[in-house]
């Protein structure tokens, strides 16, 4: 989009290296393509190499500089190998965006409230699968911690070095049905604050973005029926969002650019910034 491109082009990150995990996903692929307009080099890390490589090709065809790397963010040795490959191609990390994350159906309940007369086939809290819960916590929390261990070492003392984690409005108040995801994102917010303090003497800032409900291909069926009308859950969301609408990926870009550009946020550290239309601020009354 021309509008978002112009926003990104206002930030000059030339000769900086931005490393993005989960870069093949819907959200991070969009952000990566926009960040390329800052003139930064972009390293795209994802377990799905084909998805990340597609993004890299789009960036390069548009005049940017990017390369994809097949990466398992839960395998420390693999991350270290990728780090060495990136150093050969671009140098060392200046800005790390920990975008890998997600939920799992095995860690999700069917019901919002437990009741005495539930159907036997209903997946309740008591039916949540241990492996599904572990998957969600590992992917979201360890999937941010391990890349930070590897790449932050190269960022020590660098001018403008910073880390961005992707939290969620779930971190403030958990949503129904997704206890593991809500808990994992709360851990990300806590980890963000911990990192901000830990690295405060060596020049690395750490902040997080907490997206609200954004419309994407991944959640389209959850939010709208086949006729394009909001589902019951979507109506609940809209009722509890003071701005009365869903967000779009483009609306995260301004928050991200603000946090990563030290010309705008050099004294901003340890912040979890909601981009949710007021959802996390509203009590419902």
From Swiss-Prot:
InterPro entries: NAD(P)-bd_dom_sf (IPR036291), Sc_DH/Rdtase_CS (IPR020904), SDR_fam (IPR002347). GO terms for molecular function: oxidoreductase activity, acting on the CH-OH group of donors, NAD or NADP as acceptor. Substrate binds at residue 168. Keywords: NAD, Oxidoreductase. The keyword Oxidoreductase applies. The active site is at residue 181. It holds the Pfam family adh_short. Its EC number is 1.-.-.-. The keyword NAD applies. SUPFAM superfamilies: NAD(P)-binding Rossmann-fold domains (SSF51735). Transmembrane segments: none annotated. Belongs to the short-chain dehydrogenases/reductases (SDR) family. This is Uncharacterized oxidoreductase HI_0048.
